[in-house]
Each structure stands twice: as structure tokens, then as C-alpha cells.
Amino acid sequence: MSKLTIVRGFNDVLPLDSYKWQLLESKVKLILDRYNYSETRLPIVERSELFHRSVGESSDIVSKETYDFQDRNGDSLTLRPEGTAGCVRMVIENNLATRGQTQKLWYCGPMFRYERPQKGRYRQFYQLGVEAYGFDGIAIDLEVIAIAWSLFKELGISEYVTLELNSLGSSLNRQEYTQALLQYLKPYHAELDEDSIKRLDKNPLRILDSKIEKTQKILANAPKLIDFIDHDLRLRFKQTCQYLDALGVRYKLNENLVRGLDYYTGLVFEWTTDKLGSQSAICAGGRYDGLVENLGGQKTAAIGFAIGMERLLLLLEDLGKLPNQDNACDVFFILDSAQLHQSLAIVENIRQELPQLKIDMDLKFGSFKSQFKKADKSGAKVAIIIGQDELDNGFAGIKFLQQNEEQQQVAFNELINFLER
């Protein structure tokens, strides 16, 4: 029979790589605990309508990239392509943002998009999401940016990432700007790239995000979104930049930053790097003050961001910021297979009393000679021998594997004290 292989665009995390994920996840939790955000765990399957109403029917994600299917009841379901919509659904369904309540939440888990697989872009990818609800002022904008900045500093990569900012204004501002942009682009229709021509009808603002040099030259003299934004929102954006200056967070303004999801309003931002080739964005977010109401909840201020975990790990690896994994155990037990009922009880007692120790043994229980060979390869500092003689005399044999010391004997009731030293 032919060998089965993994689905294209999906990845296994092998045992030798899992420590990298554990390290990153521990840093994430450390930072988010510091800001008093609470973890939530969301289903990976949602009703398709949720993403049609939030991400947008015309977005690339919904129109080209979602994994959709019908269950046995005929309901249309989707593997989540992003986390914000599901988080908003949870907040509404559980009345977490009613009567002036505020919520500061985070989640981390797999998302699914049918995209062309390449370095840093997979069809199943892990995303950290940070979301805050019920906060109107600038302070929350600064806090979510500071969370990402703190994480990058904790990981030692802050000098390799750049914060880019823009303001999308209100929905009315964007409608007025969209009409002005379409009017400007009319004479250039034949010169636009294929994707931009498609976006003219579906989502004209996404043309600003084009990476095609010819299109960017056409856009150089196009109307600017900032000129269509209300005075109050423009002032808020200016104040946000001033506060970031005071916090020492480096940033640059990017008037073409529009984001690929329809729910964003006001402030939008991305953290980018030049170390990952074309996949330069490692974190992106912004305000989405209308989404809770659009999905059936009360009018609620909201802001959040997402970090692509695989891309972040790639950046950490490329910059040499991940320590080598230490697979060595601390103690290796060498046991007599004929007396396991006694010796295994001793080992398990030590595991319970000293949970910080990494303890291993040869579960095939070969000859003592073969067990000693495995002990030498294990990286353990000591081997503890429990054979028939040791059990008869009440003493375990202690062999030091990394030091030139003579073998010792330690009474079984003193083993824990010995290993604590």
C-alpha cells in the first residue's frame, strides 16, 4: 500500500520543534498576564454566515480562501479563517459586552485559509488574537500596541520590526473616499493589474494595498484617505501618534494601509519586518467599533490584533533568538526487570516528590549493560541502579555519568534528599 502523506499546506510540529512553540506560548502568556487579559478558547468551526457578515462577502478571505462545508443537517459551516469574528460572536452570545461591561481577552489556535503555501504562509496556521471590548478612549489603542511591543521586546526582536499606522476614518468617510478614488482611477483602468481591476467593483480600498509597482505609481497622485476623515478622528489619530512618541514606540505612517477585512474602522496598524521576504507582516490589527452591533449585539467599542505564530517563530529562528533544546534528562534509572513491582514504585514516588526532575529509564528493560549505554546517551547527570542486590540490601547504586566520581550507595529512604542536593 502507498504511504499516506500530510495534506498540502499543513504541517506537523515534530517533537524536536515543539519546545519552540512552548517557549513562545509561555512568553505570550507572561505578557498578557502582565496586562490582565483573560484567555478564551473558541471553536474552530463557525456558521459561514458569521464570516460573510463580518469579514465581508467581497474580501479575498471569504470569496477565495475559506474552507466551507455542509454538515448532515445541511447547515453551511466554515473552518475559521480568523479569530475576531468568533470572539465577537462569543461576546454577544454570552452577554459579555452589555450595560457598559468591558472585556480584555486573548486566544491562540489554528486558523484555516486556502492559500498558495509558501514560507511563512500555510493553509493551517496558528494565530494569537488579542481583543478588547467596551473601551472608547485612546488609552486602549495605546495598550494593545504596547502589548505587541512588549512581546517583541521580551523576545529580543523589537529592533527588527516596524510599526506602521493609518486611520480609516468612519464608514461614511470611507464611502466618500471610495467614490473619489474610483473617479481618479477611471482613466487608468486598462493600466491596472488584474487583481486591482477585480477590486474596483468589490473592494476598491484594497487597491491601495497592491504590491504591483506600476499600480503604486498610478496611486502616487491619487486622493488621500486622510483628507476625507472627520476632524475629530483625524485629531484622535494625531494624539495616538503623540502618545506613542512619549512611550518610545517607533512607528511610521502608511497612508496605503487599509487591511483586508471589512470590519475595521479608525486606527489600523501592522508590525512588519524585512527579514522574511514577501511575508513581511507578523502582526496586524485595529479598531472595529461597528462589528459587535453588525453581528446583533449592542453598540460596542472594540479593538484587537492578531499575530501569525509561524511567522513569528520563523523570524526568531532566522535571528538566532531561539535557544537550543535541552533534551537531556536529570536522572536515568537502571532496573531489574524481575523486580519491577518494587523498583517502579520507588521511581514513581520520586517523580511525585520531585516533580521538577526529568526522569527516564529503558522501558524495554534490557541487560544492565544495554541500559547503561542508554543512560550514557540520555544526557543524565546520574544513573540510579535498583537491582536484586540493591533491593535486598536497601540501598540504591549511584553512578555519576558526567563527573569522575566513584559509584556510591544511598539508602532508599535517603534518595529524595540525595536528589534534592
UniProtKB/Swiss-Prot annotation:
Name this protein carries in UniProt: Histidine--tRNA ligase
Keyword annotations: Aminoacyl-tRNA synthetase, ATP-binding, Cytoplasm, Ligase, Nucleotide-binding, Protein biosynthesis
GO cellular component term, pick one: cytoplasm
Broad enzyme group: ligase
Gene3D superfamilies per record: Anticodon-binding domain (3.40.50.800), Bira Bifunctional Protein, Domain 2 (3.30.930.10)
Family: Belongs to the class-II aminoacyl-tRNA synthetase family.
GO biological process terms, semicolon-separated: histidyl-tRNA aminoacylation
Statement: the UniProt record of this protein carries the keyword Nucleotide-binding: yes
Alphabetical list of HAMAP family matching this protein: His_tRNA_synth (MF_00127)
GO molecular function: ATP binding; histidine-tRNA ligase activity
Signal peptide from the UniProt entry: none
